UniProtKB/Swiss-Prot annotation:
Residue numbers spanned by region Disordered: 328-370
A UniProt-annotated Pfam family: RsgA_GTPase
Protein name as it appears in the record: Small ribosomal subunit biogenesis GTPase RsgA
Organism listed in the record: Trichormus variabilis (strain ATCC 29413 / PCC 7937)
This protein's record includes keyword Phosphoprotein: no
Swiss-Prot/TrEMBL cofactor(s): Zn(2+)
Binding site for GTP: 146-149, 197-205
Domain CP-type G: 97-255
GO molecular function, one term: metal ion binding
């Protein structure tokens, strides 16, 4: 058990603003016994006026020198709190249990993936891409389908059966009708949860329902594209009434699946089930047209797997080309976002001679004739 010295506090970074860090202190440091002498207390306050629940902190120079970054979600030790000014200094970053790069969050426990069953309609390919991206994080995935009041119970059952075959048990909710919001709250209790999903599905509205006093900006769905406008600009943790922290992330439509081709198959629960009872003939099988493959078959998302695999192979090839300057191929970008590999010309062989070099050559020739 860690022992903290006098003047040290433990907390969680809930927001990063330039070189400042908003730290939410643990509950036990806000007890009446931890107040300094002479500090006034209002009896009708739910918590003592001092110490504060949040401190705006800087990072110690020592941490900067050793390159220790501070992320949202980090558990940190705060020294020398200035209760009057609401300031402090981060002296230490405790070891991280998990770490996400995009969005940059530490110590997250699970991902709450929010989609809508209507307005915008549920797109299987887009949902599959988000699910694979969520699986790559190694966190637990909770699938939540909003706007369930817009479809019939029969349609809900069809969607549920389909997603069960994918390996996921969806939870149908409606923020507008307050359907199953309490069930979502149970999943989030005492955990750090990352909320993800495309724009326009009701993520911000759901967070507003879970934390009524947060008042996140809510974007309407664009009529032209049937997609929501981006309403979340940065990553921040918000405290839930029943314990736990919620991280809202910037909305985006198609996340990158940035895993290796060999790893991809393990991010499909259906494929994992097949590999649990059988093995492929080849250890490096990519489950396309190899003989005696245990994964290839008639499961619904197999076509999604092949498309994501092609993307992963193309990405890996591009990384290899960028890392090898002596490569004989180069990636050339075409119009409309398309790209292709072309033979690389020999360096300097086809370069036009500069005018300066031509003049110098003429001067040398003139001097030789003299």
């Amino acid at each position: 058990m860690r022992v903290f010295t006098t003047g040290q506090l433990l907390g969680t970074v809930v927001a990063v603003q330039a070189n400042f860090y908003k730290v939410q202190l643990d509950q036990d440091v806000r007890e009446p016994g931890s107040r300094g002498a002479g500090e006034e207390v209002h009896l009708d306050s739910p918590l003592p006026l001092y110490p504060l629940s949040l401190l705006l902190c800087t990072r110690r120079t020592r941490l900067k020198k050793i390159g220790q970054q501070v992320m949202v979600g980090d558990r940190v030790v705060v020294e020398e709190p200035d209760w009057a000014g609401g300031r402090g200094a981060i002296a230490e970053v405790l070891s991280r249990q998990t770490q996400l790069d995009r969005p940059p969050i530490a110590n997250a426990d699970q991902i709450l993936l929010v989609f809508a069953v209507a307005d915008p309609p549920l797109e299987p390919y887009q949902l599959s891409r988000f699910l694979v991206k969520a699986e790559t994080t190694g966190l637990d995935v909770v699938l939540c389908l909003n706007k369930s009041d817009l479809v019939s119970p029969e349609i809900q059952q069809q969607i549920s059966d389909r997603l069960l075959a994918w390996g996921y048990q969806p939870l149908f909710i409606s923020v507008e009708k307050q359907i199953n919001i309490d069930q979502i709250a149970k999943y989030l209790s005492n955990k750090i949860t990352v909320v993800a999903g495309p724009s326009g599905v009701g993520k911000s509205s759901l967070i507003n329902a879970l934390i009524p006093d947060i008042n996140l900006r809510v974007g309407e769905v664009s009529g032209k594209l049937a997609r929501g406008r981006h309403t979340t600009r940065h990553v921040e943790l918000f405290e839930l009434p029943n314990g736990g922290l919620l991280a809202d992330t910037p909305g985006f439509n198609q996340p990158d699946v940035d895993c290796s081709p060999e790893e991809l198959v393990h991010y499909f629960p259906e494929a994992r089930e097949r590999l649990a009872v059988a093995s492929c003939r080849f250890n490096d099988c990519l489950h396309r047209d190899e003989p005696d493959c245990a994964v290839r078959g008639d499961w619904e998302r197999y076509e999604h797997y092949l498309e994501f695999l092609a993307d992963a192979i193309a990405r890996q090839t591009q990384l290899y080309q960028q890392a090898d300057p002596e490569s004989t191929l180069k990636l050339k970008t075409k119009g409309k976002g398309q790209s292709q590999y072309e033979p690389k010309l020999e360096s300097k062989k086809y370069r036009r001679t500069s005018r300066r070099t031509q003049v110098q050559g003429l001067q040398d020739l003139y001097q030789e004739e003299e």
